[in-house]
């Protein structure tokens, strides 16, 4: 059973009611994204869940305004609680809304998303977990339409996907006018196949940077893993 909370160095994530708990791959993605947000002033987190990604980015930015959109009522309440208790409460906002219907005046410089996974896999008995884990509620096509509508010209977006779905998404993104800039394949160990892909897209075509990130080797965290998460994890 997952813990009801996850303590980071500078913030706490309550996760009693949110269907999707803090995971290692989500933490890696949050840290990786936070290094790429840079001086962006307006950031959007689509499908915020507990607010993990929002707070990881907030920790690494000085004055970025981060809006977190979440459709599930219990997850939204928990994210709002996590935001209020954080050191960055004044510049992180929780918006309970369907991203398809979400409207905003000023477009975003950077969009991050850890969308529903496993649309073809066996569903669980929990409706909330199904909503979080399956893509019937928000398809990749609908996600891309929302990103295209909300991202300003010259902006970037980053997405975490199961590796077996990344090629499909890259094709869809290209048709929507987005070019892949970076791709990181995440592996549990050197002997395991990649299970997650961290992808960065923009409007301009560039030479794609591709790499691998291994979480553990010889039962210890790798140097790459530690470098990304040492500012977040308590015991690194």
Give the role of each language-model region.
Residues 31-105, 110-113, 119-124:
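Conserved SAM/SAH cofactor-binding pocket of Class I
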Residues 191-236:
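SAM/dcSAM-binding transferase cores
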Residues 10, 63-65, 89-91, 154, ...:
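A generic structural signal for alpha->beta connector loops
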Residues 18, 22, 138-194:
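Conserved Class I SAM-dependent methyltransferase catalytic core
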Residues 14, 67, 93-95, 181-184:
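General small-molecule cofactor/ligand-binding pocket signal
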Residues 29, 114, 143, 201:
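Residue-level signal for inorganic ion chemistry
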Residues 2-42, 48-59, 214:
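SAM-dependent Rossmann-like transferase core, predominantly class I methyltransferases
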Residues 115-142:
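Mobile active-site "lid"/loop adjacent to the S-adenosyl-L-methionine
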């Amino acid at each position: 059973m997952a813990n009801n909370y996850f303590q980071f160095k500078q913030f706490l994530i309550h996760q009693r009611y949110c269907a999707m708990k803090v995971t290692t791959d989500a933490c890696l993605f949050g840290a990786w994204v936070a290094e790429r947000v840079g001086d962006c002033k307006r950031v959007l987190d689509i499908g915020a869940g507990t607010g993990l990604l929002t707070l990881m980015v907030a920790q690494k930015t000085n004055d970025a305004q981060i809006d977190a959109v979440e459709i599930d009522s219990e997850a939204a309440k928990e994210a709002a609680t996590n935001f209020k208790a954080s050191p960055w409460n004044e510049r992180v906002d929780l918006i309970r809304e369907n991203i398809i219907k979400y409207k905003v005046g000023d477009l975003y410089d950077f969009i991050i998303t850890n969308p529903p996974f496993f649309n073809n896999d066996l569903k669980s008995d929990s409706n909330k977990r199904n909503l979080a884990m399956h893509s019937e509620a928000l398809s990749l096509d609908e996600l891309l339409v929302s990103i295209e509508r909300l991202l300003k010209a010259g902006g970037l977006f980053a997405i975490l996907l199961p590796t077996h779905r990344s090629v499909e998404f890259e094709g869809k993104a290209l048709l929507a006018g987005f070019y892949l800039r970076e791709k990181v394949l995440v592996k549990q160990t050197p002997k395991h196949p990649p299970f997650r892909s961290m992808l960065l897209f923009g409007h301009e075509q560039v030479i794609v940077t591709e790499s691998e990130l291994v979480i553990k080797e010889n039962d210890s965290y790798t140097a790459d893993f530690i470098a990304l998460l040492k500012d977040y994890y308590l015991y690194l």
